[in-house]
């Protein structure tokens, strides 16, 4: 097992969580279930995982919900409720900070080779835009000049966890399946016209009653509600920014025409 080093740019996130996904899967027992479901493995010892999520990387531009080490591999898991084609670039910034932390005590100018854990990038998407079960995003797709063999590449696998998508994965991981069900309930309540706070409270109460994330929501009810409201507000802010950008683009196009 690789031991994580506390990052110089932030400590491991043990307190504030920016999302329900981060709250749920920062618990190693639940995170191991998700890892097993994604990779088709059957590990049973949560001690195999070393969580090394950066505490201060929670601002909108560069954040990651959970990063962890297992063996000599580094995994970065994130949920997204809005579609974002810039995920490879964001992950590049984030993993650079992680590698800086992991190698902080080592001499990068040494003649001895410094080995680093192999990275894997995975995003769980549960937004309202329609997308297939899996999408592969590449950093090279963002380059202004396309090259057949780019010298720097980063690949992000985006998995759709909305109803009707990736059912085998959801069936293999109860926490992920119930997380998707909870977020769907919040969204349904908001669409029905409830104020955000009431929509979240009804979703929490309903899920506890129906046995969806029951233990987690009973134990973390107050914090889960606050985080869910924060998540919705952040998602709404991003949607408004995108709509304004589209309107500006349309107006500029009209002016140019």
Annotated model-derived regions:
Residues 1-256:
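Elongated, amphipathic alpha-helical interaction scaffolds
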